[in-house]
């Protein structure tokens, strides 16, 4: 997981989406057309630390990337920590 996007187990999903857009060489305008919404709304999404699951699913499908994996890893780490 990208440590600059995580803070003591807290996931900032907006930053992770933004980083993936850059890796994929996709623009905010492209994502806005895919999900569909305005560019301004996408910029707001990128600033948000958490998102509604339905919106995250739309983004994951549009970008063909499973953003839920970050949450699954975070839960797995917490369970491992708890069980020792």
Q: Language model features by range: what are they?
A:
Residues 23, 34, 62:
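Residues within the alpha-helical elements of helix-turn-helix
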Residues 1-26:
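A short, Lys/Arg-rich alpha-helix, primarily the initiator
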Residues 2-8, 71-84:
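Short, charged recognition helix plus adjacent turn
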Residues 35-51:
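Recognition helix of helix-turn-helix/homeodomain-like DNA-binding domains
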Residues 48-61:
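Short, basic-rich loop-to-helix N-cap that marks the start of a DNA-contacting helix
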Residues 30-32:
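Short alpha-helical "recognition helix" segments of helix-turn-helix
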């Amino acid at each position: 997981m990208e440590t600059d996007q995580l803070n003591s187990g807290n996931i900032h999903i907006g930053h992770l989406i933004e980083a993936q857009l850059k890796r994929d060489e996709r623009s905010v305008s492209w994502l806005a057309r895919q999900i569909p919404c305005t560019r301004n709304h996408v910029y707001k999404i990128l600033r948000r630390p958490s998102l509604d699951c339905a919106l995250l699913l739309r983004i994951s499908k549009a970008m063909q990337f499973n953003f839920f994996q970050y949450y699954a890893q975070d839960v797995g780490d917490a369970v491992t920590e708890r069980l020792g």
